[in-house]
Protein backbone atom coordinates (compact mmCIF):
# COMPACT_ATOMS: atom_id res chain seq x y z
CA UNK A 1 0.00 0.00 0.00
CA UNK A 2 1.13 3.56 -0.61
CA UNK A 3 2.43 5.46 2.37
CA UNK A 4 0.63 8.71 2.90
CA UNK A 5 2.60 11.54 1.33
CA UNK A 6 3.65 13.89 4.13
CA UNK A 7 2.12 17.33 4.00
CA UNK A 8 4.36 20.33 3.63
CA UNK A 9 6.28 22.19 0.96
CA UNK A 10 8.13 20.17 -1.68
CA UNK A 11 11.84 19.52 -1.52
CA UNK A 12 13.82 22.09 -3.51
CA UNK A 13 15.40 20.78 -6.70
CA UNK A 14 18.96 21.78 -7.61
CA UNK A 15 20.62 21.86 -11.01
CA UNK A 16 24.08 20.63 -10.10
CA UNK A 17 27.19 20.96 -12.19
CA UNK A 18 30.93 20.95 -11.86
CA UNK A 19 33.51 23.41 -10.65
CA UNK A 20 37.23 23.68 -11.28
CA UNK A 21 39.32 24.98 -8.39
CA UNK A 22 42.96 25.31 -9.41
CA UNK A 23 44.03 22.03 -10.99
CA UNK A 24 41.16 20.02 -9.54
CA UNK A 25 37.60 19.30 -10.60
CA UNK A 26 34.56 18.86 -8.37
CA UNK A 27 31.27 17.40 -9.63
CA UNK A 28 28.05 17.43 -7.62
CA UNK A 29 25.03 15.15 -7.58
CA UNK A 30 22.04 16.33 -5.57
CA UNK A 31 20.54 13.64 -3.32
CA UNK A 32 17.12 14.89 -2.17
CA UNK A 33 15.37 13.89 1.02
CA UNK A 34 12.07 12.07 0.47
CA UNK A 35 10.47 14.43 2.96
CA UNK A 36 11.24 18.09 3.35
CA UNK A 37 12.52 19.00 6.80
CA UNK A 38 12.90 22.55 8.02
CA UNK A 39 15.78 23.88 10.12
CA UNK A 40 16.29 27.24 11.74
CA UNK A 41 17.77 28.97 14.76
CA UNK A 42 21.31 28.13 15.74
CA UNK A 43 24.34 28.47 13.54
CA UNK A 44 25.10 24.75 13.21
CA UNK A 45 21.68 23.44 12.31
CA UNK A 46 22.60 19.94 11.19
CA UNK A 47 24.69 17.21 12.81
CA UNK A 48 25.35 14.07 10.77
CA UNK A 49 27.37 10.86 10.66
CA UNK A 50 27.27 7.48 8.96
CA UNK A 51 27.16 3.90 10.21
CA UNK A 52 26.97 0.66 8.21
CA UNK A 53 26.17 2.56 5.03
CA UNK A 54 23.26 4.54 6.48
CA UNK A 55 23.20 8.18 7.49
CA UNK A 56 22.10 9.69 10.79
CA UNK A 57 20.97 13.31 11.06
CA UNK A 58 19.88 15.79 13.68
CA UNK A 59 17.84 18.66 12.23
CA UNK A 60 17.67 21.57 14.66
CA UNK A 61 14.59 23.79 14.41
CA UNK A 62 14.03 26.25 17.24
CA UNK A 63 10.30 26.23 16.42
CA UNK A 64 9.94 22.43 16.44
CA UNK A 65 11.07 20.88 19.72
CA UNK A 66 9.88 17.41 18.73
CA UNK A 67 12.00 17.30 15.57
CA UNK A 68 15.01 18.83 17.34
CA UNK A 69 14.96 16.12 20.02
CA UNK A 70 15.25 13.25 17.53
CA UNK A 71 17.89 11.61 15.38
CA UNK A 72 16.77 10.37 11.97
CA UNK A 73 18.35 7.44 10.13
CA UNK A 74 18.27 7.40 6.32
CA UNK A 75 19.46 5.13 3.54
CA UNK A 76 20.34 6.30 0.04
CA UNK A 77 18.05 4.41 -2.34
CA UNK A 78 17.62 5.31 -6.01
CA UNK A 79 19.65 8.48 -5.38
CA UNK A 80 17.23 9.65 -2.72
CA UNK A 81 17.49 9.78 1.07
CA UNK A 82 14.85 7.38 2.34
CA UNK A 83 13.79 7.44 6.04
CA UNK A 84 14.60 4.21 7.89
CA UNK A 85 14.29 4.90 11.62
CA UNK A 86 13.74 7.63 14.19
CA UNK A 87 15.40 7.72 17.60
CA UNK A 88 14.27 9.74 20.60
CA UNK A 89 17.79 11.02 21.15
CA UNK A 90 18.72 14.70 21.14
CA UNK A 91 21.79 15.10 18.96
CA UNK A 92 21.34 18.76 18.12
CA UNK A 93 24.58 19.83 19.82
CA UNK A 94 26.78 16.90 18.81
CA UNK A 95 26.38 13.58 17.02
CA UNK A 96 28.92 10.96 16.01
CA UNK A 97 28.96 7.17 15.66
CA UNK A 98 32.03 5.01 16.12
CA UNK A 99 32.74 1.88 14.11
CA UNK A 100 31.16 -0.32 16.81
CA UNK A 101 27.82 1.45 16.62
CA UNK A 102 28.24 3.56 19.74
CA UNK A 103 26.47 6.86 19.14
CA UNK A 104 27.73 9.95 20.96
CA UNK A 105 25.21 12.76 21.41
CA UNK A 106 25.29 15.93 23.46
CA UNK A 107 22.25 17.43 25.12
CA UNK A 108 22.86 21.03 26.21
CA UNK A 109 25.30 20.06 28.98
CA UNK A 110 26.38 16.41 28.78
CA UNK A 111 27.61 13.86 26.25
CA UNK A 112 25.88 10.47 26.43
CA UNK A 113 26.60 7.20 24.63
CA UNK A 114 23.94 5.01 23.02
CA UNK A 115 24.46 1.52 21.58
CA UNK A 116 22.74 1.26 18.20
CA UNK A 117 23.16 -2.53 18.31
CA UNK A 118 21.49 -3.00 21.69
CA UNK A 119 17.88 -4.03 22.24
CA UNK A 120 17.12 -0.48 23.40
CA UNK A 121 19.28 1.97 21.45
CA UNK A 122 17.46 4.94 23.00
CA UNK A 123 18.67 4.05 26.52
CA UNK A 124 21.71 6.21 27.36
CA UNK A 125 24.74 5.17 29.33
CA UNK A 126 26.10 7.40 32.07
CA UNK A 127 26.99 10.97 31.16
CA UNK A 128 30.62 11.29 30.11
CA UNK A 129 33.08 13.42 32.04
CA UNK A 130 33.49 15.78 29.09
CA UNK A 131 31.25 17.84 26.84
CA UNK A 132 31.66 19.27 23.36
CA UNK A 133 31.41 18.40 19.69
CA UNK A 134 32.05 14.72 18.91
CA UNK A 135 33.89 13.12 16.00
CA UNK A 136 34.30 9.35 15.63
CA UNK A 137 36.78 7.39 13.56
CA UNK A 138 35.56 4.67 11.20
CA UNK A 139 38.98 3.01 11.07
CA UNK A 140 39.90 2.65 14.74
CA UNK A 141 38.30 2.73 18.17
CA UNK A 142 38.52 6.47 18.65
CA UNK A 143 36.17 9.36 19.35
CA UNK A 144 37.31 12.94 19.84
CA UNK A 145 35.36 15.38 22.03
CA UNK A 146 36.16 19.06 21.61
CA UNK A 147 34.98 22.12 23.51
CA UNK A 148 36.18 25.45 22.10
CA UNK A 149 39.63 26.44 23.40
CA UNK A 150 39.96 23.33 25.57
CA UNK A 151 42.32 20.41 25.01
CA UNK A 152 40.80 17.84 22.63
CA UNK A 153 39.81 14.67 24.50
CA UNK A 154 40.55 11.30 22.89
CA UNK A 155 38.20 8.49 23.95
CA UNK A 156 39.81 5.09 23.32
CA UNK A 157 38.80 1.79 24.94
CA UNK A 158 36.90 3.64 27.63
CA UNK A 159 39.94 5.75 28.53
CA UNK A 160 40.02 9.53 28.27
CA UNK A 161 43.17 11.38 27.25
CA UNK A 162 43.45 15.16 27.13
CA UNK A 163 45.71 15.76 24.15
CA UNK A 164 48.34 18.49 24.30
CA UNK A 165 48.84 20.01 20.85
CA UNK A 166 52.37 20.95 19.80
CA UNK A 167 53.08 24.66 20.24
CA UNK A 168 53.89 27.23 22.89
CA UNK A 169 50.62 29.17 22.92
CA UNK A 170 47.40 28.77 24.93
CA UNK A 171 46.27 25.78 22.86
CA UNK A 172 49.05 24.42 20.67
CA UNK A 173 50.12 27.18 18.28
CA UNK A 174 46.95 29.21 18.88
CA UNK A 175 45.65 31.62 21.49
CA UNK A 176 42.13 30.53 20.48
CA UNK A 177 40.91 27.60 18.38
CA UNK A 178 37.27 27.82 17.32
CA UNK A 179 37.24 24.85 14.90
CA UNK A 180 38.37 21.26 15.22
CA UNK A 181 37.37 18.01 13.62
CA UNK A 182 38.71 14.53 13.03
CA UNK A 183 39.38 13.48 9.44
CA UNK A 184 41.03 10.14 8.87
CA UNK A 185 43.77 9.92 11.50
CA UNK A 186 44.35 13.66 11.75
CA UNK A 187 42.89 16.48 13.83
CA UNK A 188 42.10 19.45 11.60
CA UNK A 189 41.88 22.82 13.32
CA UNK A 190 41.45 26.52 12.69
CA UNK A 191 42.82 28.96 15.22
CA UNK A 192 44.26 32.39 15.87
CA UNK A 193 48.04 32.52 16.55
CA UNK A 194 47.76 36.01 18.06
CA UNK A 195 44.99 38.53 18.61
CA UNK A 196 45.24 39.97 15.10
CA UNK A 197 41.95 38.50 13.88
CA UNK A 198 43.71 36.28 11.32
CA UNK A 199 42.90 32.57 11.54
CA UNK A 200 45.07 29.77 10.20
CA UNK A 201 44.48 26.09 9.45
CA UNK A 202 46.67 23.48 11.14
CA UNK A 203 46.64 19.67 11.08
CA UNK A 204 47.91 17.44 13.90
CA UNK A 205 48.46 13.73 14.32
CA UNK A 206 46.84 11.83 17.18
CA UNK A 207 49.91 12.41 19.36
CA UNK A 208 49.47 16.17 19.00
CA UNK A 209 52.36 16.73 16.57
CA UNK A 210 51.79 19.46 13.99
CA UNK A 211 51.73 18.07 10.44
CA UNK A 212 50.73 21.11 8.38
CA UNK A 213 49.85 24.76 8.75
CA UNK A 214 48.27 27.03 6.16
CA UNK A 215 50.64 29.42 4.43
CA UNK A 216 48.08 32.23 4.65
CA UNK A 217 44.98 33.06 6.72
CA UNK A 218 41.81 31.10 5.96
CA UNK A 219 38.48 32.70 5.09
CA UNK A 220 36.68 32.05 8.37
CA UNK A 221 37.31 30.96 11.96
CA UNK A 222 34.44 28.51 11.52
CA UNK A 223 35.39 25.91 8.93
CA UNK A 224 34.18 22.51 7.77
CA UNK A 225 37.34 20.55 6.99
CA UNK A 226 38.34 17.29 5.37
CA UNK A 227 41.62 15.54 4.63
CA UNK A 228 41.80 14.53 0.95
CA UNK A 229 44.33 12.39 -0.95
CA UNK A 230 45.93 15.56 -2.36
CA UNK A 231 45.74 17.82 0.68
CA UNK A 232 43.01 19.52 2.68
CA UNK A 233 39.60 20.91 1.72
CA UNK A 234 38.11 23.71 3.83
CA UNK A 235 34.64 25.19 3.53
CA UNK A 236 34.85 28.70 4.96
CA UNK A 237 31.33 29.90 4.20
CA UNK A 238 30.16 29.96 0.55
CA UNK A 239 33.75 29.26 -0.48
CA UNK A 240 35.98 26.18 -0.72
CA UNK A 241 39.73 26.47 -0.13
CA UNK A 242 42.34 23.88 -1.14
CA UNK A 243 45.64 23.38 0.69
CA UNK A 244 48.56 21.08 -0.13
CA UNK A 245 49.60 18.32 2.33
CA UNK A 246 52.11 20.72 3.94
CA UNK A 247 49.54 23.52 4.24
CA UNK A 248 50.61 25.53 1.20
CA UNK A 249 47.61 27.41 -0.21
CA UNK A 250 46.63 26.08 -3.63
CA UNK A 251 43.43 27.81 -4.75
CA UNK A 252 39.91 28.71 -3.68
CA UNK A 253 36.54 29.10 -5.31
CA UNK A 254 35.36 32.65 -5.88
CA UNK A 255 33.00 34.11 -3.25
CA UNK A 256 30.76 35.90 -5.77
CA UNK A 257 30.37 36.19 -9.52
CA UNK A 258 29.01 34.38 -12.52
CA UNK A 259 31.55 31.56 -12.63
CA UNK A 260 33.89 29.54 -10.42
CA UNK A 261 31.61 29.87 -7.39
CA UNK A 262 29.91 27.09 -5.48
CA UNK A 263 26.68 28.07 -7.29
CA UNK A 264 28.21 26.49 -10.38
CA UNK A 265 28.68 23.25 -8.44
CA UNK A 266 25.51 22.99 -6.35
CA UNK A 267 23.12 25.24 -8.24
CA UNK A 268 23.01 27.78 -5.42
CA UNK A 269 24.96 28.84 -2.36
CA UNK A 270 24.45 26.43 0.52
CA UNK A 271 25.77 26.52 4.06
CA UNK A 272 27.67 23.28 4.67
CA UNK A 273 27.66 21.76 8.15
CA UNK A 274 29.43 18.41 7.67
CA UNK A 275 31.60 16.56 5.15
CA UNK A 276 31.20 12.76 5.32
CA UNK A 277 33.73 10.48 3.58
CA UNK A 278 32.66 8.00 0.93
CA UNK A 279 35.17 6.22 -1.31
CA UNK A 280 38.53 7.80 -2.08
CA UNK A 281 37.30 10.09 -4.86
CA UNK A 282 33.97 11.11 -3.32
CA UNK A 283 32.34 12.53 -0.21
CA UNK A 284 28.96 13.77 0.96
CA UNK A 285 28.52 17.48 1.61
CA UNK A 286 25.67 17.98 4.11
CA UNK A 287 24.25 21.42 4.70
CA UNK A 288 21.24 23.65 4.48
CA UNK A 289 19.76 26.09 2.02
CA UNK A 290 17.10 28.73 2.29
CA UNK A 291 15.43 31.63 0.64
CA UNK A 292 14.53 34.80 2.49
CA UNK A 293 10.84 33.93 2.21
CA UNK A 294 10.89 30.47 3.81
CA UNK A 295 12.75 28.38 6.40
CA UNK A 296 15.97 26.61 5.48
CA UNK A 297 15.91 22.95 4.51
CA UNK A 298 18.64 20.29 4.76
CA UNK A 299 20.51 19.43 1.55
CA UNK A 300 22.94 16.65 0.66
CA UNK A 301 25.25 16.49 -2.35
CA UNK A 302 27.52 13.68 -3.45
CA UNK A 303 30.77 15.35 -4.50
CA UNK A 304 33.15 13.50 -6.81
CA UNK A 305 36.64 14.96 -7.17
CA UNK A 306 40.22 14.24 -8.15
CA UNK A 307 41.49 16.34 -5.23
Short names for language-model regions:
Residues 57, 104-105, 145-146, 188-190, ...:
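Residue position within the beta-strands of beta-propeller blades
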Residues 26-39, 80-87, 120-130, 159-172, ...:
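A short beta-strand motif characteristic of beta-propeller blades
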Residues 64-72, 109-114, 149-155, 195-202, ...:
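Structural motif
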Residues 40-49, 89-100, 128-142, 170-182, ...:
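Repeated scaffold domains used in trafficking and secretory/extracellular systems
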Residues 54, 101-103, 141-142, 185-187, ...:
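Conserved core beta-strand positions within WD40 beta-propeller blades
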Residues 273-307:
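Blade-level signature of beta-propeller repeat domains, shared across WD40, Kelch, NHL, RCC1
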Residues 1-75, 81, 85-88, 111:
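N-terminal "mature head" segments of proteins
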Residues 75-79, 115-119, 156-159, 205-209, ...:
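Short loop/turn segments that connect beta-strands within beta-propeller blades
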Amino acid sequence: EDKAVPAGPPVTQFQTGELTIGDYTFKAQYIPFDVRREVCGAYHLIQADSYRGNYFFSFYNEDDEEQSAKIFEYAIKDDRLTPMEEYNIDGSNALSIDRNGILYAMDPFDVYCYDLNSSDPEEPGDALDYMGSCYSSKDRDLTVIYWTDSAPVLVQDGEYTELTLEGDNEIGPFCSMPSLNLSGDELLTVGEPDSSGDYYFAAFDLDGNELARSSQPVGSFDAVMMKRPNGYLLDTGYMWELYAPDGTFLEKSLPVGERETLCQLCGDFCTFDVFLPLEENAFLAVGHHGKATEPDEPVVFRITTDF
